Design a protein with these regions (language model features):
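Two-component histidine phosphotransfer core
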Residues: 1-182
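C-terminal end segment of the histidine kinase catalytic
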Residues: 186-187
Length: 187
């Protein structure tokens, strides 16, 4: 039963990721076809990673960071200087695991739910703190009529509880949103 729950939680990522990126691609096709072609090439690389890892419960932190860099390329193509993402490169040296696509989902949610402009860029930081990988972003919520369903965070928490019985730490401060993902030790 736990394996079935894990598969359902992992499958929630696929449509969420796909439709958000196709929406970006659609806008780029109208704006600049050469840029759209380059974006599509990188989207293919990113999507290949997602497909290749759907059946895996965890990936190395090094693999996940490499994937996140590819994803950030797509983000920079779309948002340019409106989003500033800083990844501590020493994360690649950690001998541990993480559920696939968790970091990307947190970065995507930060961008989706916060105001960002070239004048006031949204800052997102990814770094290590003790036995956690931390994704921290400025908190500047977009004023809108829609209420977040929290599916992304619920998905991540659910995956962690099923995999290692550890729960990610999620905190909203006055100006900062923080998620701490436990590093899963290699066994």
């Amino acid at each position: 039963a736990a394996q079935m729950q894990l598969e359902v939680l992992k499958s929630q990522i696929d449509p969420h990721f796909m439709f958000n990126n196709f929406s970006i691609l659609s806008e780029l096709i109208v704006e600049d076809t050469a840029l759209a072609e380059k974006f599509l090439d990188n989207l293919s690389k990113v999507y290949r990673y997602v497909i290749q890892n759907l059946k895996r419960d965890t990936v190395s932190i090094e693999e996940e960071i490499a994937f996140l860099h590819s994803y950030i390329y797509l983000i920079k193509m779309r948002y340019e200087d409106a989003v500033c993402i800083n990844i501590d490169e020493t994360l690649k040296q950690i001998d541990g695991q993480i559920p696939p696509v968790c970091l990307q989902l947190l970065v995507e949610n930060a961008i989706k739910h916060n105001r960002a402009s070239a004048r006031h860029p949204l800052s997102i930081r990814v770094f290590r703190e003790e036995n956690d990988i931390v994704v921290e972003n400025d908190l500047r919520p977009i004023a809108s009529d829609f209420e977040s369903t929290g599916i992304g965070n619920k998905n991540i928490v659910g995956r962690y509880l099923l995999l290692c019985k550890k729960k990610p730490f999620i905190e909203q401060r006055e100006n900062t949103y923080i998620v701490k993902l436990p590093i899963i030790n290699n066994t």
